[in-house]
Regions:
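Non-heme di-metal
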Residues: 1-405
Length: 405
């Protein structure tokens, strides 16, 4: 989505260079294309979503761009040619990744079950004359399938088998990280965990984007970029553990309590407020700078590298918040205070999760630390091994949680 948002922004700018407004860029050029993308958006399974995106939509977009390059004059239309060439480089990357994902995740049974639906998508394209509308238009009968019922966003996170204990709040990473009595090396494990746990940020941000209509295109461009950054941060955490030879799905219990709570308890505006409040806490010396310093002091070069760019990304994210969230308030101070208030209203009841059998809040830290020590070739430090502080009474920003939740 980030790549496509960037490409669309560049093409919108190019159209604006050639024509006076109104440019009609929000108008759907053909009703069949609207059905095509409604169907893909409404795909009920990951397999169908992958097939619709990477075997139909993106290859068709690539074909339309290639056709424009073939038909246009590279001298008179050079600015467009340049934009399209850059876009096609990244389209190729997206299609290659999509094909690899399909090979890994879509079996023959899923493909066979999806054949009629894929035929519907092809019929939509044929009726529209292709994505660019330059081909002969067919006259196929179109009946909506997945989009017969209008799409509604579901804010409940859905994760696979790598996340077996999604309500586990048994290990408080922040109290360990800011404890001066612990050395940098074990702290890198907590930072890898924190990065991996950031998968909940794109889960939450996607809800803001999906449920915030009618903003300027630049809003969606910026928010999609930030969502992608947060997804990259989670990947950094995974890479950190893999680099240490640690099987993180069995050693690290990554919860979804934050994204679940925000998506189901707050409005999109309130979620954005919480996001901005947290971002402001990341910028002082006790935030991203501190994590970078810990990474640099450790013997793990990946940790320092990850924290360097994680910190850099947060500079941009803070600016995005100032552009799209803060203007609704009288001052930055008011905007931050509102975010704090919204987060304080979110209920993530540690005891309720345990009492209702959702999780035992197992302290998985000793197992992770022991596995890392084996990789490092050292004996576990008894004090580090004995760390057992949870999120029962202390929030991730180290604020005390009230007894009411």
């Amino acid at each position: 989505s980030h790549y496509c948002a960037e490409h669309v922004a560049a093409l919108r700018k190019r159209v604006g260079e050639m024509r006076e407004p109104p440019l009609g860029l929000e108008a759907v050029p053909n009703a069949n294309l609207e059905i095509l993308f409604d169907e893909i958006l409404s795909a009920p399974t990951t397999g169908e979503l992958l097939l619709g995106l990477y075997e139909v939509a993106l290859p068709s977009l690539d074909d339309a761009m290639r056709k424009h390059l073939e038909d246009t004059n590279p001298l008179v239309d050079h600015p467009s040619v340049r934009v399209i060439r850059f876009a096609m480089l990244e389209l190729g990357e997206m299609i290659a990744l999509g094909q690899a994902s399909i090979e890994a995740m879509v079996d023959e049974a899923t493909r066979a079950k999806s054949s009629a639906w894929l035929g519907l998508l092809s019929d939509c394209l044929a009726n529209a004359g292709g994505l660019g509308g330059e081909k002969e238009h067919a006259n196929n009968t179109i009946n909506r399938q997945h989009s017969a019922k209008p799409y509604t966003y579901d804010g409940v996170p859905r994760r696979d088998e790598r996340f077996p204990d999604p309500y586990n709040m048994g290990v408080n990473a922040e109290t360990f990280l800011y404890d001066d009595s612990f050395e940098p090396e074990p702290k890198t494990l907590m930072m890898f965990y924190k990065r991996l746990r950031e998968i909940d940020v794109p889960e939450m941000m996607s809800s803001i984007i999906a449920e915030t209509p009618d903003k300027p295109w630049e809003y969606y461009q910026d928010m999609s970029r930030q969502l992608w950054d947060e997804a990259r941060h989670a990947m950094m955490g995974e890479v950190g553990f893999v680099n240490l030879g640690i099987n993180w799905p069995s050693e690290v219990m990554v919860n979804h309590t934050w994204s679940l709570a925000l998506n189901t308890q707050l409005t999109p505006e309130e979620r954005h407020a919480v996001l901005y409040f947290i971002e402001q806490g990341l910028m002082p010396k006790t935030g991203k700078r501190f994590e970078w310093e810990v990474g640099m002091e450790s013997d793990n070069p990946l940790s320092g590298l990850f924290q360097d760019y994680d910190w850099a990304d947060e500079v941009l994210h803070s600016r995005i918040g100032r552009d799209w969230y803060v203007p609704a308030f009288g001052s930055t101070k008011e905007a931050i205070a509102y975010g704090d208030e919204c987060w304080s209203r979110v209920l993530m009841d540690w005891n309720q999760y345990r009492d209702e059998g959702m999780t035992a809040h197992r302290n998985w830290w000793p197992g992770l630390y022991t596995a890392a020590c084996k990789n490092w070739g050292i004996d576990p430090d008894p004090k580090v091994l004995g760390y057992s502080t949870s999120y029962e009474s202390v929030r991730a920003d180290l604020k005390t949680i009230s007894a009411s939740g």
